[in-house]
């Protein structure tokens, strides 16, 4: 249990003991401890006096006074209590208890903020899963940054997380890829008789693949059409996936599993789920097609599984894939989808219900659109005209750290304008620069301290830490683990970036208010240890969103 929760629990226990001592209630109702919006109203507050009004049959202010009169303030670290308004009890704490977070952070190091106990739940987090038909763009970048950060957060919160990329290497888009490569392949050999398919891929990468295959495998031209397209499907996916994996690795995004859609066909899992759904009575035939009764499970309409030409819809392999996730022993399934996949939520949840799987185990986050902005104007993207702004170009333009930080600053369900000019600025207006500069500034101070013979572990007395800005800074450090817990619970990576900004801000305010290195050696030791705790917290928080913590800038 973190230090904040310990203090809250102690307050609850002491309030309960006080209620008993005052004889206000035989059965004590739930005691809620809140943080007042205005810090002038104390560190914590409770409305328990008003809750007890009917039970105790007394005025709430009288009840509040009785609680205060019987409270053991020392155990709860309380230095002052006010009764406000109709009966709110405001607690002002002796903030020396906060200094216990300093040696804890230093001792735990990279693990500070992480929950020690396992949640005992397996989470399969699927993200990015871009079709292997071209370069990654800004939408994929947001998905990658948020997904990877969320995986880090859930891991820190005690979940067993598997990071998975679903390779869409079957279906019409791969046939179109193969046809597009075929056209470019023969063009490279001087044969322009093969026209680009209507839904083909016109990017420069396809031209490059065609040229490369023409140089390395000219014999493919002599294959039968069926064998040739099969080879282009296979080689095309290999080329595209190698490039995607390389870009994602450079973007500091890594996966435990690369799950192939084709494997679902090879292992017979699609036929298996189809047979099972038929057996359970959830399918029917209409208009020459096979349908799934998803309306039985709150979907707005039934969905086609097999079209009237005998081909599968995208939905059928998606069902097989999600059922496979369940069979692998995952308790929670989290999908991060693009903005164009909103209609998939109800149908996927309904498909799991057909197998008796609680659909609440599937959580789907929709990544809203990102607009790339430069000099106040939107930079347009068009994947199929060859003019797309790729992830690689974004990394080259603003850097991995800035890209990842900016893309995790907002809730994924909100539209976001990515200001590339701001992301490149080396000023405190740039959020990632502001955060990293705080870390670098601390490292500089610690280096000076070491030159003076002061180590971060030298302090054993923190009573000299009394400055208001220092206390606020320590409160923020102590709030790191609760923030991770909250971010994990709400699946919200942006809570961590918000926390980083607040922590950096509190540090800069402290730095501007009080010198760390002074002639008072004991105070200096305490401050050096404190800013080391801040540095560790800042570094760990930045790592959670995949951003580095430079020691100098």
From Swiss-Prot:
It is found in: Cytoplasm. Monomer. This is Arginine--tRNA ligase. The lineage of its organism: Bacteria, Bacillati, Bacillota, Bacilli, Bacillales. CDD domains: ArgRS_core. One of its GO terms (molecular function) is ATP binding. Belongs to the class-I aminoacyl-tRNA synthetase family. PANTHER family: ARGININE--TRNA LIGASE, CYTOPLASMIC, ARGINYL-TRNA SYNTHETASE. A motif ('HIGH' region) lies at residues 130-140. NCBIfam families: argS. GO terms for cellular component: cytoplasm. One of its GO terms (biological process) is arginyl-tRNA aminoacylation.
């Amino acid at each position: 249990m973190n230090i904040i929760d310990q203090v809250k629990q102690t307050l609850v226990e002491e309030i309960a003991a006080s209620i008993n001592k005052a004889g206000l209630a035989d059965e004590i109702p739930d005691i809620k401890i809140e943080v007042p919006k205005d810090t002038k109203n104390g560190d914590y507050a409770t409305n328990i006096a008003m809750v007890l009004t009917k039970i105790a049959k007394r005025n709430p202010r009288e009840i509040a006074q009785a609680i205060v009169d019987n409270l053991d303030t020392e155990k709860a670290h309380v230095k002052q209590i006010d009764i406000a308004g109709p009966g709110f009890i405001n607690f002002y704490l002796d903030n020396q208890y906060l200094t216990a977070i300093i040696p804890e952070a230093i001792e735990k190091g990279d693990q500070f903020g992480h929950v020690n106990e396992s949640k005992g739940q397996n989470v399969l987090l699927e993200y990015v899963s871009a079709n292997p038909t071209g370069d990654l763009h800004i939408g994929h970048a947001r998905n990658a940054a948020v997904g990877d950060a969320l995986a880090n957060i859930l891991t820190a919160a005690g979940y067993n997380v598997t990071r998975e990329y679903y390779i869409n290497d079957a279906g019409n888009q791969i046939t179109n890829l193969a046809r597009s490569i075929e056209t470019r392949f023969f063009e490279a050999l001087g044969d322009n008789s093969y026209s680009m398919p209507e839904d083909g891929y016109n990017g420069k990468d396809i031209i490059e693949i065609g040229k490369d295959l023409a140089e390395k495998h000219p014999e493919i031209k002599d294959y039968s059409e069926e064998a040739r397209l099969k080879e282009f499907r296979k080689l095309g996916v290999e080329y595209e996936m190698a490039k995607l994996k390389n870009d994602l690795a450079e973007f500091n995004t890594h996966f435990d599993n690369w799950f192939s859609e084709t494997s679902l066909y090879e292992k017979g899992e699609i036929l298996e789920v189809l047979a099972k759904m038929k057996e359970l009575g959830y399918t029917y035939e209409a208009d020459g097609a096979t349908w799934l009764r998803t309306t039985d499970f709150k979907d707005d309409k039934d969905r086609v599984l097999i079209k009237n030409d005998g081909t599968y819809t995208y939905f059928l392999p998606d069902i097989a894939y999600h059922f496979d996730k369940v069979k692998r022993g995952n308790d929670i399934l989290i999908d991060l989808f693009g903005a164009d996949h909103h209609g998939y939520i109800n149908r996927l949840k309904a498909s799991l219900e057909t197998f008796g799987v609680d659909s609440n185990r599937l959580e789907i986050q929709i990544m809203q659109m990102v607009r790339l902005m430069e000099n106040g104007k939107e930079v347009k993207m068009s994947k199929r005209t060859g003019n797309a702004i790729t992830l690689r170009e974004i990394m080259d333009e603003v850097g991995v750290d800035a890209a990842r930080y900016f893309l995790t600053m907002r809730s994924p369900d909100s539209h976001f304008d990515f200001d590339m000019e701001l992301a490149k600025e080396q000023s405190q207006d740039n959020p990632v620069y502001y955060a990293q500069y705080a870390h670098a500034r601390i490292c500089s101070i610690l280096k000076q301290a070491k030159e003076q013979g002061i180590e971060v572990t030298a302090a054993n007395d923190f009573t000299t830490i009394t400055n208001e800005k220092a206390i606020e800074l320590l409160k923020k450090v102590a709030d790191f683990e609760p923030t991770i817990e909250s971010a994990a619970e709400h699946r919200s990576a942006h809570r961590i970036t918000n926390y980083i900004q607040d922590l950096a801000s509190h540090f800069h305010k402290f730095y501007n208010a009080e010198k760390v290195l002074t002639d008072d050696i004991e105070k200096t030791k305490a401050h050096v240890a404190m800013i080391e705790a801040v540095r560790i917290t800042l570094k760990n928080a930045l790592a959670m969103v995949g951003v580095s913590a430079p020691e100098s800038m």
